């Protein structure tokens, strides 16, 4: 061996020895200073080199994580690519992250969906927790999503639901099945556009409304994927799964639509001086005392949030609820009996009837439990130092997903039949007081804490009102036996039915009810 090689080897060995021990000393001193001398990460699977746990997730990550939690516990830690990922799978674990440590997990991690679909995270969903996000949230609550704002557009909901009933009645007269997801998307898009833009975006259900529905579903599906580039940024440019390319193409379609809507709206602003709509308020009040100002991308990104999340999440919940009722007809009959007693059969269900319909509310809660629209909630990021959760150490920069789907199937919360659709579980005892608005961590379909879904009130109202109206107004019939009804899921940001629901409807109220 040459002297040069021997010297080089000794130098390398010495450098490695010093580096290793200095690193240990730094970690020890930092731990002593911060109180984290015993840094015990939550348990979790080992994963693969470089890829970490990515290959373990499969097509249904929420189910995979739920199964992992049975082995590793309520809080898990996985290395996914170059990032740490914490998974909370029980109500107590969710509460620790989303309430006790809410501020520390108030940001979203960067991801391809935020970059390519949400105008580089300029929207209300993915924006950094700060003044601009607060301004978007404030305007949305004040003029569209808050309690008072919802009251102001109650007539819009009633009118658009009337159009939907008329279309379904016509389908029944023509002996045609109703495609539930298409009908719901069409109605909800027009409800929202009346409030946002003072006009219906679709004058009739057809190719354009179906294309919009397909775009919304594609967005919600692709935004929920575990994209390799998000977890291994160094190879993100390769787009190995083709996800980012699809996002870019979809964004162009949405941008054309949103730009046209925004330009048309600006041209007609004088017509609404006496009665401004939501978009007028946003444009006129798009700044705050902190000097934040909403630009065009912020406004288009906000519209994208409202139209996509506002139509897809609520419509998917209603579709799941109807599917469960058609699979369990005794539940459908019980719901109709309750409505006939409270409302009668001479008029439509009104929003004011809902507090007097506990079984309807229980059906909605049970659907939120079993089929949450966002099964893994939206990801969050640990932004302020290192934290302890349930005795475990969570490093700064760790990503967080709360497995809402797993919480809804926790036997310690829901008993021995968590996979059974049983609205009665919400009628009696402790569960009767559970509310899905983010304060009871057994049922958090909209999330909780600062980043809870801004449309929580609207989502609950739309689900209860529309589902109740459909159940009260029609009898329902499948073209096959209930046992053949497909109840498989398709994973995404929202949990879709793998096979869309189609059914025949039979009017059960007087003819005048079906006139808008």
Curated annotation (Swiss-Prot):
State the pathway, as annotated in the record: Pigment biosynthesis; anthocyanin biosynthesis
Question: What this chain does, per the record?
Answer: Catalyzes the 3'5'-hydroxylation of naringenin and eriodictyol to form 5,7,3,'4',5'-pentahydroxyflavanone and 3',5'-hydroxylation of dihydrokaempferol and dihydroquercetin to form dihydromyricetin.
**Any idea which positions bind heme?**
453
| Database matches in PANTHER family | CYTOCHROME P450 98A9 (PTHR47944), FLAVONOID 3'-MONOOXYGENASE (PTHR47944:SF18)
The Swiss-Prot or TrEMBL record lists the needed cofactor(s) as:
heme
Q: Which organism is it from?
A: Gentiana triflora (Clustered gentian)
Q: Which PROSITE patterns match?
A: CYTOCHROME_P450 (PS00086)
Q: Which family does it belong to?
A: Belongs to the cytochrome P450 family.
- Any GO molecular function: iron ion binding
> Reaction(s) catalyzed by this protein?
a 3',5'-unsubstituted flavanone + 2 reduced [NADPH--hemoprotein reductase] + 2 O2 = a 3',5'-dihydroxyflavanone + 2 oxidized [NADPH--hemoprotein reductase] + 2 H2O + 2 H(+)
Q: Which gene encodes it?
A: CYP75A4
In Swiss-Prot or TrEMBL terms, this protein is called Flavonoid 3',5'-hydroxylase
Q: Name one GO biological process term.
A: anthocyanin-containing compound biosynthetic process
Answer yes or no on keyword Heme: yes
Write the record's keywords in alphabetical order, separated by commas.
Heme, Iron, Metal-binding, Monooxygenase, NADP, Oxidoreductase
EC number(s)?
A: 1.14.14.81
Q: Which InterPro entries match?
A: Cyt_P450, Cyt_P450_CS, Cyt_P450_E_grp-I, Cyt_P450_sf
Q: Which SUPFAM superfamilies match?
A: Cytochrome P450
Q: What is the lineage of its organism?
A: Eukaryota, Viridiplantae, Streptophyta, Embryophyta, Tracheophyta
The broad enzyme category this protein falls into is oxidoreductase
Gene3D superfamilies from the xrefs?
Cytochrome P450
Record Pfam families:
p450
């Amino acid at each position: 061996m040459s002297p040069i090689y021997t010297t080089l080897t000794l130098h390398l060995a010495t450098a490695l020895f010093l580096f290793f021990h200095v690193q240990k000393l730094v970690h020890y001193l930092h731990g002593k200073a911060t109180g984290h001398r015993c840094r015990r990460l939550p348990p979790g699977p080992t994963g693969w080199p470089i890829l970490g746990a990515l290959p373990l997730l499969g097509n249904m990550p929420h189910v995979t994580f739920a199964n992992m939690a049975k082995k590793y516990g309520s809080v898990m830690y996985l290395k996914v690519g170059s990032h740490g990922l914490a998974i909370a799978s029980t109500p107590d674990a969710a509460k620790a992250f989303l309430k006790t440590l809410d501020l520390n997990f108030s940001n979203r991690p960067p991801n391809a969906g935020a970059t390519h679909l949400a105008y580089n995270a300029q929207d209300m969903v993915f924006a950094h927790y700060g003044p601009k996000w607060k301004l978007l949230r404030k305007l949305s609550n004040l003029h569209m999503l808050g309690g008072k704002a919802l009251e102001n557009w109650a007539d819009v909901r009633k009118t658009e639901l009337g159009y939907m009933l008329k279309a379904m009645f016509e389908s029944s007269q023509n002996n045609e099945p109703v495609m539930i997801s298409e009908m719901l998307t069409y109605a909800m898009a027009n409800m929202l556009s009346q409030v946002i833009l003072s006009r219906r975006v679709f004058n009739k259900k057809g190719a354009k409304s179906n294309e919009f529905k397909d775009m919304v579903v594609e967005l919600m599906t692709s935004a929920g994927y575990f994209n390799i580039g998000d977890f291994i940024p160094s190879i993100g440019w390769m787009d190995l799964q083709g996800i980012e390319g699809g996002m870019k193409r979809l964004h162009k379609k949405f941008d054309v639509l949103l730009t046209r809507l925004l330009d048309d709206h600006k041209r007609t602003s004088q017509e609404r001086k006496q009665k401004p709509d939501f978009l007028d308020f946003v444009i006129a009040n798009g700044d705050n005392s902190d000097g934040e100002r909403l630009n065009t991308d912020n406004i288009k990104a906000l519209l994208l949030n409202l139209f996509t999340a506002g139509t897809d999440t609520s419509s998917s919940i209603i579709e799941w609820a109807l599917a469960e009722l058609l699979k369990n007809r005794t539940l459908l009959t019980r719901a109709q009996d309750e409505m006939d007693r409270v409302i009668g059969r001479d008029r439509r269900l009104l929003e004011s009837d809902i507090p007097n319909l506990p079984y309807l509310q229980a059906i909605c809660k049970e659907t939120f439990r079993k089929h949450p629209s966002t099964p893994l909630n939206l990801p969050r990021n640990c932004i302020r130092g290192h934290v302890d959760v349930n005795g475990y150490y969570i490093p700064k920069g760790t990503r967080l997903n709360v497995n809402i789907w797993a919480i809804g199937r926790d036997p310690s919360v829901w008993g021995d039949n968590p996979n059974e659709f049983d609205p009665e579980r919400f009628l009696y005892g402790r569960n009767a007081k559970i509310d899905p608005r983010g304060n009871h961590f057994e049922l958090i379909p909209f999330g909780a804490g600062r980043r809870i879904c801004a449309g929580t009130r609207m989502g609950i109202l739309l689900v209860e009102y529309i589902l109740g109206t459909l159940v009260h107004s029609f009898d329902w019939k499948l073209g096959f036996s209930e046992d053949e009804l497909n109840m498989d899921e398709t994973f995404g940001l929202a949990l879709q039915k793998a096979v869309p629901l189609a059914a025949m409807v039979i009017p059960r109220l007087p003819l005048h009810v079906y006139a808008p």
